[in-house]
Design a protein with these regions (language model features):
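Non-heme Fe(II)/2-oxoglutarate
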Residues: 1-90, 106-109, 205
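Catalytic core of non-heme Fe(II) oxygenases with the double-stranded beta-helix
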Residues: 93-165, 170, 179-182, 194-197
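Double-stranded beta-helix
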Residues: 185-206
Length: 206
């Protein structure tokens, strides 16, 4: 007998540098002063399931420079991006504007996917116990959940994954109603023609 497993794409998990983690966390702790961002994830009565805020240009530059090599690594390890097949030739990849997610005990992120090609979630401040869930179809068409259990020791870690991979975050429990889970998320996209023509700095990911 020789069992065979069908191939699939996956995700990359790694850790921020200490300096970048401290810089992002510092801004995350005061990001309510930044512009509010709408993600479209709402409760049935039309309220966002948790607040979202923009990230400073300075931290965006640091973050994008850090993440760039991981995009190349993902493309080397998984066939997903090169198999998309909607373009006549390769094109550069660019970063969308990231955002902070602030979640208190009653907040959550329902099952959803992102725009773009790849997405990332960076855990900056975590409660005693929470989880991040991927959901995808098996080869038999059934729904399968992949759960990542998180504790404060996971602060500073991040995931890079396909944007169309469904994921969710359930509410966490805490005796402190003001305890806050801080996560930074963002998307990586194909660079549009207009942006490509007008830009003096074109990414070299192809």
């Amino acid at each position: 007998m020789n069992p065979q497993y069908l191939p699939n794409d996956g995700y990359i998990a790694s850790t921020l540098t200490g300096d970048l983690f401290e810089s992002l966390l510092e801004e995350g702790l005061r990001c309510e002063n930044n512009k509010s961002v709408s993600t479209g994830l709402q409760t049935p009565d039309g309220v966002e399931t948790c607040p979202h805020y923009g990230v400073s240009e300075e931290n965006c530059e640091k973050l994008f420079a850090f993440l760039a090599p991981y995009i190349e690594t993902y493309m080397e390890q998984f066939p997903y991006i090169k198999s998309i097949g909607i373009l006549s030739s390769d094109c550069p990849i660019t970063f969308g504007e990231p955002w902070f997610n602030l979640q208190k005990p009653n907040h959550y992120l329902p099952m959803h996917m992102h725009d773009g090609v790849l997405s990332y979630s960076i855990w900056l401040q975590l409660p005693a116990s929470s989880e991040f869930i991927f959901s995808y179809a098996t080869i038999t068409g059934k729904s399968s959940d992949y759960r990542i259990n998180l504790t404060p020791t996971d602060s500073g870690k991040f995931l890079l994954f396909p944007s169309t991979l469904n994921h969710a975050v359930h509410p966490f429990k805490s005796d402190d109603p003001n305890e806050t889970r801080i996560v930074l998320s963002g998307n990586i996209l194909f660079q549009g023609v207009a942006e490509l023509i007008n830009s003096n700095q074109i990414n070299n990911f192809t």
